[in-house]
């Protein structure tokens, strides 16, 4: 009894809130076998076909390329693109791409040579012997991005799930009307689907693997059951048809009963999901060494006489594919890329097929009905009942129209999956999804502007801090230079101090300054005063030398004779003074007598000078 209860719990499926049941419109393309689209005259490959920045070019105009040759470099979340066939690159220029804005993006234009020659391939039949990181790099370099519509880099998603993944879900629901690409892929390539699942199991090691498929695909269900025969590690879950059961959060709720929190991804609750088309691309990349250069595209609508699914090379113009399906242009022509609920009208039929192009819908005028004008919201609440994400579409609409960005963000605008269920049930014909997309774009633009402003402010503050540091360092260097002597200046100061010391006390002692000690201004002043003293000494020596030279010049004879006469007179007066002094002493006078010795000395000096003068006159 317990085992039966466990089995029923194991096979149980849940339901999600909201959702709608629009006409399916799948039979016109799902009952026809897939066809291979011939090569067009020119392929246009946009450099950015995934969620992330475009890669760096590896080729140039005029270069010959081979099928599968990478055209850009893949690093990080940048997924490379490859040449869909062999041929010549005729141009690398902007071209209109599959985007609602109709803006041109950089594209590589290739003219096929008709040979369809592959680059060298290295198949990995023994992928289980390969390292996990090698497998991830193989998937990344093959340029694989999510083929379900989001275009998230597959290798990055798998790398983030290497640890902590409990459940691996293969999304085969394909819930949007008209689209049958995955349906036909499972019918005709079920074995490749299962092989791709085994590769993912080897990488992620999940506890369980679930395939979720809607019950409106009986042929695909039968094909998968045949491919799974004898394998009990992969479980096929058939779920009721309801739009949008193919949404990641909605299918997670259906198969596991777990709800992904607001603002989170399914990996936060241990679930990782891959689209069935992505699984086939992984198998071909790992085992066959085939990069993502083609995909299945549904061509449908009443404007086509031969709708169906085509294997189309990436870069094939939309108009070329439409002609293969018997396109009958309407007046005015209307072509939608994607489904009727989540797709968008193409700005031009010259745009190329990209990796996320799963459907081209060419409806007739009667099929789409008349376009009714938008009216005011009547607050009926039908959009709230239909929303599968549990949001308040009416409030988000008012916030978007009023440009109340923070309120829209706080009401979880970015959890909107843009499924179009709210617009489908709106009686006022309000294109709610368009408002939400525009509001998201505006918020992202504001966030980018704020980020750029914050970066600019950080750069400015860093610059100001750097300038302040440089100013302080410069002032410190100037202060140090004012007191710090060079080696030559230090030697000069030491020499001056030594000379002053020797002059003052005659010693030979040297004043030593300890190593590393910063001299003060007194040393500089002492050196300056020493230099001044030296200059004064040299000046005095020069003056003394000049005086000596003047003294040693030729003596005037007349001056010598006069000097001799004066000397004799002084000597005579000295003798007379001696006699006068004697008389005065005898008379009892108190006057002081002159010292006879001084007089004798003076007389002797006078005689010597007279003799020298006579010799100067008569040297012989």
Swiss-Prot record:
Pfam families: Complex1_51K, Fer4_7, RnfC_N, SLBB. Binds 2 [4Fe-4S] clusters per subunit. GO terms for cellular component: plasma membrane. It is an enzyme of class 7 (translocase). Residues 366-397, 407-436 form the 4Fe-4S ferredoxin-type domain. One of its GO terms (molecular function) is 4 iron, 4 sulfur cluster binding. Its cofactor is [4Fe-4S] cluster. It is found in: Cell inner membrane. It comes from the Bacteria. Its EC number is 7.-.-.-. GO terms for biological process: electron transport chain. Keywords: 4Fe-4S, Cell inner membrane, Cell membrane, Electron transport, Iron, Iron-sulfur, Membrane, Metal-binding, Repeat, Translocase, Transport. [4Fe-4S] cluster 2 binds at residues 387, 416, 419, 422. [4Fe-4S] cluster 1 binds at residues 377, 380, 383, 426. It is a peripheral membrane protein. Belongs to the 4Fe4S bacterial-type ferredoxin family. RnfC subfamily. The complex is composed of six subunits: RnfA, RnfB, RnfC, RnfD, RnfE and RnfG. Part of a membrane-bound complex that couples electron transfer with translocation of ions across the membrane. This is Ion-translocating oxidoreductase complex subunit C. It comes from Yersinia pestis bv. Antiqua (strain Antiqua). The lineage of its organism: Bacteria, Pseudomonadati, Pseudomonadota, Gammaproteobacteria, Enterobacterales.
